[in-house]
Amino acid sequence: MKEMLSVGFMVFSIFFGAGNLIFPPLLAQNAGTNYPMAVVGFLTTGIGLPLLGLIAIVKVSGKYTELVEKRVHPWFRIITFGLLYLAIGPLFAVPRTGAVSFEIGIRPFLPVDFMAEGQYIYTAIFFILTYFFAANPSRLVDTVGKVLSPVLLLFLCVLFVRTFYAPIGEILPPIEQYIDAPFASGFTDGYLTMDLLAALAVGGLAISAVKAKGVTEQKAIYKTCIKACLVAIVLMGAVYTALAYLGATCPSVLGYSANGGIILSSATYVFFGDAGKLVLAFIIGFACLTTSIGVSAAFASYYQYVSDGRLGYKKLLLGATLFSYWAANMGLTELIRISVPFLVALYPIFIVLVILSLCDDLFQGSSLVYRLSIGMTLPFSIMDGLQAAELPLPGVHDFLMTYLPLYSVNLGWLLPALAGAIVGILWNQMHKGYQPA
């Protein structure tokens, strides 16, 4: 029990990133009275899939990239995991930490005519610190991170109690895509957490943590990790659901906000005044910084590894932090808007990979099943990404909108992926023992 709870809280802390706190309030603000169904969709991809990803990694003893290389193709592994580390690194996740900490912690205290200059100055300091600590690893960063996660959780608990005791306002009717498709909209909103990608990148930590507790037998490691994941599911589900309720009660009084950072900051001010905003700013700022340091270091380490050392760690780190600085200054709302099409196109590939790897024994690990299912997923997920970017292919878009179920809600890949897997399984049944080269 002790090992299960310890690892469960560790898994929770991995995914309990300050940057992800902005999404449930924004989703619920727009979903209004439909927010419960939207939250279920969000939890499916924001919590369920990452924890399935962890289980998939535990199942193969941490050797997940080797499984992908063997089942699909070496180049597929190189390209997809290269994109994964870019997404959770300098493309989106790292600049988002700088943008979120500015939006929540600094913007509320700046005069309007100094907003742009303030953002440039703050993010410069933020990413200089990111580079310095990532280039010079220190236990101080780990210690600060371990302290701040419980402090942030405690602050949010106080905020949640206040919200449930005396909500800011009434819940309004849904708007935009949440009127007709709250679950599907919440499902794709969950992509923005990028926690499935993070799970596949750092999932080996869960195995290491269990082994460090003295559990060495593979079956016992597997059981402990699954139980720990259930602990993390309960904690994360409670936090995200409470954040969603907070967001749903805000627009009737505070109006509609452009992003979740504004909602959190405004709600904190309503309940606790400037003192509350200062506390939240401090906690979020340092929590985002520790996340930025860890993820930037992981990105640089991965690309140094796959390049066989031809790309130096510090050069990669410098490039990542400079790019993150530029991207963060686009602003949080714009950064999220740009990331959506990329994630809508990329996420389905990893969803299919994780589900197939969990069901691997059912079709004897057939490479054909993997290749057909992913091969059918890829073109349709790209089409979904183009639609999310409002750049649909003429003719093709209209055809898919008419004849492909779920395409209108950016889930057009789902049935083709299932069809590819079924065809692969049936082919194997008719050709026992066949494996493609």
Language model segments and positions:
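Select transmembrane alpha-helical segments in multipass membrane proteins
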Residues: 2-11, 36, 74-87, 120-125, ...
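Hydrophobic, membrane-embedded alpha-helices of multi-pass small-molecule transporters
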Residues: 6-16, 161-169, 178-243, 279-291, ...
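Helix-loop-helix connectors at the membrane interface of multi-pass transporters/channels
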Residues: 27, 99-118, 211-212, 292-319
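Membrane-water interface regions at transmembrane-helix termini and the short interhelical loops
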Residues: 59-67, 126-148, 212-215, 325-338, ...
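Hydrophobic alpha-helical segments and their helix-loop junctions in multi-pass secondary transporters
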Residues: 90, 94, 153-178, 196-197, ...
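Membrane-interface loop-to-helix entry segments
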Residues: 133-163, 339-351, 370-380
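A generic transmembrane alpha-helix motif of multi-pass inner-membrane proteins
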Residues: 166, 366-437
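Extracellular/periplasmic helix-exit of transmembrane alpha-helices
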Residues: 234-263
